[in-house]
Amino acid sequence: MKAYVFPGQGAQFTGMVKDLYENSKLAKELFEKANEILGFRITDIMFEGTAEELKETKVTQPAVFLHSVILAKTLEDFKPEMVAGHSLGEFSALVANGALSFEDGLKLVSQRALAMQKACEIKPSTMAAVLGLADNIVEEVCASIDGVVVAANYNCPGQLVISGEISAVER
């Protein structure tokens, strides 16, 4: 069985799919369309920006979405039997499956990212992946810390994401 599984936020890195942009007419057209839709040159940040610029939610989410969707569109001969996505990757899966257009998917992801960015500016917070500990241990540690910190995403056994106030998460 062939499948695409698309990642969520956190999979970004500077320079991702730059080679595809430079060598694929379809990829370049889609990236340029994305620059227009977003109202800024996300390609400049994706290909040449700093890790800090790329880490901003309002940039990260559209960048990861574009990486996933454009890669899938350039591999259309692959024809997966199923698609799935983790968190943000669910939007990429919807576009890859034809349930959403590229344009609508990008607009939704951009609005989602802006809303999340705004929420972070109103109430500064953060997330951190905790690897190699049992869920109940992480939950107990979170409960013992002053401030707000909770187990937020149970990714898989041994990988849990915590979120909350910056000072509490950093403890």
Which role fits each region the language model picked out?
Residues M1-K2, T126:
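Residues that mark the start of a beta-strand
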Residues K2-A84, I162:
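Helix-rich "cap/lid" substructures immediately adjacent to catalytic or cofactor-binding pockets
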Residues Q9-A11, L38, N97-R171:
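Alpha/beta catalytic cores of group-transfer enzymes, especially the acyltransferase/condensing modules
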Residues G15, D19, K33, I70, ...:
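Alpha-helical scaffold segments in soluble metabolic enzymes
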Residues K25, E32-K33, L66, I70, ...:
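A broad detector of short, well-ordered amphipathic alpha-helices
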Residues G49-T50, S87, V109-R112:
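A general structural motif at alpha-helix termini
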Residues V83-H86, A152:
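Structural motif
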Residues H86-V95, A99-L100:
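Glycine-rich nucleophile elbow surrounding the catalytic serine of serine-hydrolase chemistry
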